[in-house]
Amino acid sequence: MGEVASNLKQYPARNVEIIVHVDEMLGETKRAELVNALEGIEGISSAEFCPLRWHLMLINYDRELLNSQQVLTGVVANNVHAELIGPV
């Protein structure tokens, strides 16, 4: 994954940040598990929940490797309901 993250630094035009709305109210442990799972996907450089708005996630990814629907699929694959809001 470090190589993918360095690619984003090397090619910033490939970096896209999106907002995803998570329907469930997730506890701290489940949020951490979801972030770890997403950051383990090749092409995703970072994932985080917005402080005080725990239903919103900011996810950075390499658009040469993934598209927004694939990122959303990665979220939903972790047994949560979510919708793509759009780019930041």
For the regions a protein language model found, what residue spans apply to each?
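Short amphipathic alpha-helical segments
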Residues: 26-30, 67
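Short amphipathic alpha-helices in soluble, non-transmembrane regions
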Residues: 33-40, 70-79
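A generic structural motif
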Residues: 55-60
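Helix N-cap motif at beta-to-alpha junctions
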Residues: 61-66
